[in-house]
Regions:
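N-terminal non-catalytic cap/leader segment that marks the start of a structured domain
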Residues: 1-125
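Glycine-enriched loop-and-adjacent helix/strand subsegments that border the catalytic/binding cleft
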Residues: 93-167
Length: 167
């Protein structure tokens, strides 16, 4: 499942990409699922409780939130949802999937192709690691803030691994 954090109408939302490549607002889709399938009128409130308010809360909720997200996506695939919450990619602005993560420990110079592109042309003899401040994480469409004196910016590949509790 591809999880996303996105902005729609100036509001940050958590979502997932459906099998058609659309962005699904998980809160709205799960609330619709609860109202239609579970026959509850408290779908909006229950969706927030089960899924969390943001991606960090969603991830902390673990399997229960993941099951709810799957139900939301199945619901979208099975029903004609008129309440909205399903967007074409161009209708939303993607943010970093986890906009406010905890500690980030990064490995530097870990791809030989990237090392070869760098001026030193020599890989490290020992592992290189560094910390990132959580506020430095941005989305794929965001500008990279930097001082005007900076003439060259380097890129890096990002990979997130979310490990399920008990694994």
């Amino acid at each position: 499942m591809k999880l996303v954090t996105f902005i729609h109408q100036d509001k940050e939302r958590i979502g997932a990409v459906d099998n058609l490549g659309r962005i699904v607002d998980l809160h709205r889709a799960y609330a619709s699922h609860l109202q239609k399938v579970e026959s509850t009128s408290a779908g909006d409130r229950l969706a927030e409780i089960v899924l969390g308010r943001d991606m960090v809360e969603f991830l902390k909720r673990g399997n229960e939130a993941l099951a709810a997200a799957r139900n939301a996506l199945d619901h979208i695939a099975s029903y004609d949802v008129n309440g909205g919450g399903v967007f074409d990619r161009g209708q939303v602005r993607l943010k970093s999937p986890v906009p406010r993560p905890g500690a980030l420990i990064s490995a530097g110079k870990n791809f030989s192709d990237h090392v070869a592109e760098m001026a030193s042309k020599k890989g490290p003899t020992a592992p290189v690691a560094f910390l990132k401040l959580p506020g430095t994480v941005i989305g794929p469409e965001d500008d990279i803030p930097h001082p005007s004196e900076v003439k060259n910016l380097d890129y890096e590949v990002e990979l997130a691994i979310v490990i399920e509790p008990g694994r």
